[in-house]
From Swiss-Prot:
UniProt xrefs under InterPro entries: Cyt_c_oxase-like_su1_dom (IPR023616), Cyt_c_oxase-like_su1_sf (IPR036927), Cyt_C_Oxase_1 (IPR000883), Cyt_c_Oxase_su1_BS (IPR023615)
Catalytic activity annotation: 4 Fe(II)-[cytochrome c] + O2 + 8 H(+)(in) = 4 Fe(III)-[cytochrome c] + 2 H2O + 4 H(+)(out)
Protein name according to UniProt: Cytochrome c oxidase subunit 1
Domain of life of the source: Eukaryota
Subunit structure, interactors included: Component of the cytochrome c oxidase (complex IV, CIV), a multisubunit enzyme composed of a catalytic core of 3 subunits and several supernumerary subunits. The complex exists as a monomer or a dimer and forms supercomplexes (SCs) in the inner mitochondrial membrane with ubiquinol-cytochrome c oxidoreductase (cytochrome b-c1 complex, complex III, CIII).
EC number: 7.1.1.9
Cofactor(s), names only, from the UniProt record: heme; Cu cation
Main location group: mitochondrion
Source species of the chain: Theileria annulata
Binding residues for heme a3: 382
Keyword terms, alphabetized: Calcium, Copper, Electron transport, Heme, Iron, Magnesium, Membrane, Metal-binding, Mitochondrion, Mitochondrion inner membrane, Respiratory chain, Translocase, Transmembrane, Transmembrane helix, Transport
Family per similarity comment: Belongs to the heme-copper respiratory oxidase family.
Task of the protein: Component of the cytochrome c oxidase, the last enzyme in the mitochondrial electron transport chain which drives oxidative phosphorylation. The respiratory chain contains 3 multisubunit complexes succinate dehydrogenase (complex II, CII), ubiquinol-cytochrome c oxidoreductase (cytochrome b-c1 complex, complex III, CIII) and cytochrome c oxidase (complex IV, CIV), that cooperate to transfer electrons derived from NADH and succinate to molecular oxygen, creating an electrochemical gradient over the inner membrane that drives transmembrane transport and the ATP synthase.
Sequence positions that bind Mg(2+): 374-375
Length: 480
């Protein structure tokens, strides 16, 4: 029944924002499953010390796995699901509009997503692939002679064009609202999160588009923008990429903030505490997020004054972030009735994960500590807590919120209440030990490690296996 419903969505060319939003969610689901299976392969290799699945002759496969895992989950799972899915399905409803201003542009954006995905994934089948890491740093990305890097670049450009079109559409829709009684500070934080995300995309996507094209010309037309032996500067690539890369973090998580705020106010039958301050906090985070890209580059030789600036501004982001946490927790206090305990439990999981990830982020924001921890799995544990798991939990919450439209069924509150603690245990097993092994230090992006690290890595693999079993169980339930 579910698969027939999905086929009917993609077989009908429709400009309706809800149909497009649901189509985005299904695309994000299948993209995410492929990316998740890649991470399971990575964790399977790391489950025991020594090379088990990967051999000395096939080490490039490991590089391919974590490269494609990062690209798929960032650009085709989280962005497609949160920005495309939530934005298209919910945003016009929250603004009191019947649809977005340009429905057909929405449809074109949707069709570009699978095109970009196919281009990125097809890079695996060409020669030695393109295991450069998801950041595509030169000179590694410019020195590989195969066409795989070029396919990744064009795939990401296609996804970027789709996001740009959606951003213009959402901002234009916001600017053209003529709803009676429309008051700008009474708009739901969920709607504001889409608006702020759209502005961040319009600010940062032209930069990363330019830098990807510069890499393409370096590779194919000998322009040498990033070739240090010919007056190029590879550090320039890092500055330009992370000027997009750090706002990208908030591009992915801001819609999650909005949906958690919406769910708390809906299912606790209470108005969101501090609605205006929540909007201001998200705006402050979006602004400060554009000013801290250098904290990803502490190991690249930044001078002391520059490190001090980026450290200070990074710590400042904790203030509006703490304000959001305070608003959510206060909304949950003294609740008289809860409509869906399962969804509220997932919202609480989001808050807990974000607090853990934010706390470890304050550690990494310190330049002196980051130099030591930057190339360890501590960083992997941090951004999976604060970004990946937080974004996935908010996406799960939204999917359950519209489950009748998406699946044609309703998952019981008892099932959701059972899934939430199991999911949290799996997440803690998978990513919490990485903080301990990161201090050892255990390097990231390496398929082997000393035998004394086996216990922690086995726990991480056990947690990843639990998440895999949980995902397959839920897929089986909704396919009945």
């Amino acid at each position: 029944m579910v698969f027939e419903f999905v086929l009917s969505l993609f077989n009908s060319v429709s400009g309706n924002h809800k149909i497009i939003g649901i189509s985005y969610l299904w695309l994000a689901y299948w993209f995410g499953m492929i990316g998740f299976y890649m991470s399971v392969l990575i964790r399977t290799e790391l489950g025991m010390s020594g090379l088990k699945i990967i051999t000395m002759d096939t080490l490039e496969i490991y590089n391919l796995l974590f490269t494609l895992h990062g690209l798929i989950m960032v650009f085709f799972n989280i962005m497609t699901g949160l920005f495309g899915g939530i934005g298209n399905y919910l945003y016009p409803v929250l603004l009191g509009s019947c649809d977005v201003v340009y429905p057909r542009v929405n449809l074109y954006s949707l069709l570009l997503q699978p095109i970009g995905f196919v281009l990125v994934v097809s890079s695996v089948y060409l020669e030695i692939g393109s295991g450069t890491g998801w950041t595509l740093y030169p000179p590694l990305s410019t020195s590989l002679s195969n066409i795989g890097i070029d396919l990744i670049i064009f795939g990401l450009l296609a996804a970027g064009i789709a996001s740009t079109l959606s951003s213009i559409n959402f901002i234009t829709t916001f600017a053209s609202i003529k709803t009676i009684g429309f008051v700008i500070d009474r708009i739901s934080p969920a709607a504001w999160s889409i608006v702020l995300t759209s502005f961040l995309l319009l600010l940062s996507l032209p930069v990363v588009t330019a830098v990807f094209l510069m890499v393409f010309f370096d590779r194919n037309h000998s322009t040498m923008f990033f070739e240090s032996s010919n007056s190029g500067d590879p550090i320039l690539y890092q500055h330009l990429f992370w000027f997009f890369g750090h706002p990208e973090v908030y591009i992915m998580i801001l819609p999650g903030f909005g949906i958690i705020s919406l769910l708390l106010s809906t299912y606790t039958t209470k108005e969101m505490f501090g609605n205006q301050t929540m909007i201001l906090a998200m705006g402050s985070i979006a602004l400060l997020g554009c000013l801290v890209w250098g904290h990803h580059m502490y190991t690249s030789g930044l001078e002391a004054d520059t490190r001090g600036y980026f450290t200070t501004v990074t710590i400042l982001i904790a203030l509006p972030t703490g304000n959001k946490i305070f608003n959510w927790v206060t909304t949950l206090q003294c609740v008289e009735s809860i409509k869906s305990l399962g969804l509220i439990l997932f919202a609480v999981l989001f808050i807990v994960n974000f607090v853990i990830g934010g706390t470890t982020g304050v550690v990494l924001g310190n330049a002196g500590l980051d130099v030591v921890l930057h190339d360890t799995v501590y960083v992997v544990g941090h951004f999976h807590f604060v970004l990946s798991i937080g974004a996935i939990i908010s996406l799960i919450c939204f999917i359950v919120y519209i489950q009748r439209m998406l699946f044609g069924i309703i998952l019981s509150n008892r099932l959701l209440s059972l899934m939430a603690p199991i999911f949290m245990i799996a997440v803690l097993f998978t990513f919490l030990p990485m903080h301990f092994t990161g201090f050892s230090p255990l390097p990231r992006r390496i398929p082997d490690y000393p035998d004394e690290m086996w216990g922690w890595n086995f726990i991480c693999t056990l947690g990843a296996t639990m998440m895999l079993v949980l995902k397959l169980t839920v897929l089986f339930i909704i396919s009945l």
